[in-house]
Amino acid sequence: MIKLESLFDISERKRRKKLLGRGPSSGHGKTSGRGHKGDGSRSGYKRRFGYEGGGVPLYRRVPTRGFSHKRFDKCVEEITTGRLAELFQEGEAITLDALKAKKAIARQAVRVKVILKGDLEKTFVWQDTAVVLSQGVQNLLGIT
């Protein structure tokens, strides 16, 4: 049962709705609490998640987690026997530098793998350890 002394004054707990744009004496007149100019004064404006008023946001201040091996990965290119036949003359030495000079591989490449595709009727000198022959090319040349 509700007693009279247990009732509380509801008038103190009711908060009036903020009326905007109702004259200068209301405290929320003219710019309606939005300030002058800028994004926030425009209709439809919403702050981006994580926005901190133009300062560097937390998600950019905190260092990234984990480790990426991408910086240290070795660049390995591949080239076909048909492409080698186009680029090099009979008996020419195939080295990493020679392939880079002919722009057949990327400059940052540290190793090249020769893949059997196309004909290999010319003979070449394989003297660079960075140029690796695939199993198919080794079988074709009789190297085992």
Swiss-Prot record:
State the residue spans of region: Disordered: 18-49
CC per GO annotation:
cytosolic large ribosomal subunit
List each coiled-coil range.
none
Q: Which InterPro entries match?
A: Ribosomal_uL15 (IPR030878), Ribosomal_uL15/eL18_sf (IPR036227), Ribosomal_uL15_bac-type (IPR005749)
The Gene Ontology biological process annotation of the record reads: translation
What are the record keywords, sorted? Ribonucleoprotein, Ribosomal protein, RNA-binding, rRNA-binding
KW rRNA-binding (keyword) present:
yes
Named from the GO MF annotations, one term is: rRNA binding
UniProt subunit comment: Part of the 50S ribosomal subunit.
State the family named in the UniProt similarity comment for this chain. Belongs to the universal ribosomal protein uL15 family.
Q: What is the protein's known function?
A: Binds to the 23S rRNA.
Q: What is this protein called?
A: Large ribosomal subunit protein uL15
Organism listed in the record? Chlamydia pneumoniae
Q: Which gene encodes it?
A: rplO
